[in-house]
């Protein structure tokens, strides 16, 4: 009995620690990109997946202690997909006491009518969904639209564009919408997917399956996701370093003439970002930039014998 109680205490401690890390990540992203301002009305797009549930939970948590006042309204788009459990989200949100709106639009029927059987429906579905959410944001008087994309999504998008699109373009933590009328924010931009997965499981969110439409998954994105997961296992810190690289772009050492005036370089020009090292190799730090080991790993390191010093 005591062992079970201890296990429960340990689990609670781990959940609290995980929530603090997610809170810190979200808080830093909000501060770095000025995502939320005094008086903002944030439309939280809730799909019923782990990411959007976590985003809503952390934003609600931050709302209680934030130095500014802002409101949240959760919005779900019921696309009339077969088997969609309509009761789950209203019941969950009413239990929380969160203001919400369920938007009912038969985009599933439109997509099935327009797209031939066997072809991917994601592109058209995404455009329809985006338009409906923009309209809803206007109707609700929302000043920001919050989406649940996390750090792994952002990196996947970068590699997708590099491998298949021939451009270095990721997923912005904050940007104006393509219709020029709304500010879109991604509060989970600094959060790791594995942290979100663990938090979602611990909280027992009522997850709604994402494949109800029957569409095939994006195979290119899946390949990239698998590659990044493999790197994360084999080379701890690589994911953090790559994300850090997205925040430390050096245009003078790339090849985009629109970002840097290469043609304007003449004798007497100033040295930019260390200049050209010619045949010298750039110093690379031994420890991956932007990476810190898990607390558990750090504690294990403290317990290990330093075999070099043992006489």
UniProtKB/Swiss-Prot annotation:
<comment type="subunit">
    <text>Homodimer.</text>
</comment>
<dbReference type="InterPro" id="IPR014729">
    <property type="entry name" value="Rossmann-like_a/b/a_fold"/>
</dbReference>
<comment type="function">
    <text>Catalyzes the ATP-dependent 2-thiolation of cytidine in position 32 of tRNA, to form 2-thiocytidine (s(2)C32). The sulfur atoms are provided by the cysteine/cysteine desulfurase (IscS) system.</text>
</comment>
<keyword id="KW-0411">Iron-sulfur</keyword>
<dbReference type="GO" id="GO:0051539">
    <property type="term" value="F:4 iron, 4 sulfur cluster binding"/>
</dbReference>
<dbReference type="GO" id="GO:0005737">
    <property type="term" value="C:cytoplasm"/>
</dbReference>
<keyword id="KW-0067">ATP-binding</keyword>
<comment type="similarity">
    <text>Belongs to the TtcA family.</text>
</comment>
<feature type="short sequence motif" description="PP-loop motif">
    <location>
        <begin position="47"/>
        <end position="52"/>
    </location>
</feature>
<dbReference type="Pfam" id="PF01171">
    <property type="entry name" value="ATP_bind_3"/>
</dbReference>
<dbReference type="InterPro" id="IPR011063">
    <property type="entry name" value="TilS/TtcA_N"/>
</dbReference>
<feature type="binding site">
    <location>
        <position position="213"/>
    </location>
    <ligand>
        <name>[4Fe-4S] cluster</name>
    </ligand>
</feature>
<feature type="binding site">
    <location>
        <position position="125"/>
    </location>
    <ligand>
        <name>[4Fe-4S] cluster</name>
    </ligand>
</feature>
<dbReference type="GO" id="GO:0005524">
    <property type="term" value="F:ATP binding"/>
</dbReference>
<dbReference type="GO" id="GO:0000049">
    <property type="term" value="F:tRNA binding"/>
</dbReference>
<keyword id="KW-0460">Magnesium</keyword>
<dbReference type="InterPro" id="IPR035107">
    <property type="entry name" value="tRNA_thiolation_TtcA_Ctu1"/>
</dbReference>
<protein>
    <recommendedName>
        <fullName>tRNA-cytidine(32) 2-sulfurtransferase</fullName>
        <ecNumber>2.8.1.-</ecNumber>
    </recommendedName>
</protein>
<keyword id="KW-0808">Transferase</keyword>
<comment type="pathway">
    <text>tRNA modification.</text>
</comment>
<dbReference type="GO" id="GO:0016783">
    <property type="term" value="F:sulfurtransferase activity"/>
</dbReference>
<keyword id="KW-0408">Iron</keyword>
<dbReference type="InterPro" id="IPR012089">
    <property type="entry name" value="tRNA_Cyd_32_2_STrfase"/>
</dbReference>
<keyword id="KW-0547">Nucleotide-binding</keyword>
<feature type="binding site">
    <location>
        <position position="122"/>
    </location>
    <ligand>
        <name>[4Fe-4S] cluster</name>
    </ligand>
</feature>
<keyword id="KW-0963">Cytoplasm</keyword>
<keyword id="KW-0820">tRNA-binding</keyword>
<keyword id="KW-0004">4Fe-4S</keyword>
<keyword id="KW-0819">tRNA processing</keyword>
<keyword id="KW-0694">RNA-binding</keyword>
<keyword id="KW-0479">Metal-binding</keyword>
<dbReference type="GO" id="GO:0034227">
    <property type="term" value="P:tRNA thio-modification"/>
</dbReference>
<dbReference type="GO" id="GO:0000287">
    <property type="term" value="F:magnesium ion binding"/>
</dbReference>
């Amino acid at each position: 009995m005591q062992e079970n109680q201890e296990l429960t205490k340990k689990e609670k401690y781990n959940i609290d620690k995980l929530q603090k890390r997610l809170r810190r990540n979200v808080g830093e992203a909000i501060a770095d990109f000025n995502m939320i301002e005094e008086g903002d009305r944030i439309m939280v797009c809730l799909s019923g997946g782990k990411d959007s549930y976590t985003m809503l939970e952390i934003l609600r948590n931050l709302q209680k202690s934030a130095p500014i006042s802002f409101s949240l309204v959760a919005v779900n788009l019921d696309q009339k997909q077969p088997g969609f459990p309509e009761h789950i989200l209203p019941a969950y949100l009413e239990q929380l006491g969160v203001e919400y709106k369920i938007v009912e639009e038969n985009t599933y029927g439109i997509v099935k009518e327009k797209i031939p059987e066997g072809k991917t429906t994601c592109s058209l579905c995404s455009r329809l969904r985006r338009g409906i959410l923009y309209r809803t944001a206007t109707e609700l008087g929302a000043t920001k639209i919050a989406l649940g994309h996390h750090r792994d999504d952002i990196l996947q998008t970068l590699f997708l564009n590099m491998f298949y699109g021939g451009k270095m373009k990721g997923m912005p933590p904050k940007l104006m919408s393509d219709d020029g009328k709304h500010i879109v924010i991604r509060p989970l931009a600094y959060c790791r997917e594995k942290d979100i997965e663990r938090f979602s499981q611990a909280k027992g969110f009522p997850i709604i399956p994402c494949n109800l439409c029957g569409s095939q998954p994006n195979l290119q994105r899946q390949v990239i996701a698998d590659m990044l997961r493999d790197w994360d296992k084999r080379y701890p810190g690589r994911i953090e370093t790559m994300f850090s690289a997205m925040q430390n772009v050096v245009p003078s050492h790339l090849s985009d003439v629109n970002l840097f005036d290469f043609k304007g370089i003449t004798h007497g020009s100033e040295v930019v970002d260390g200049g050209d090292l010619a045949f010298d190799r750039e110093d690379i730090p031994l420890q991956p930039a932007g990476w810190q080991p898990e607390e558990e790993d750090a504690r294990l390191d403290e317990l290990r014998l330093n075999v070099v010093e043992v006489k």
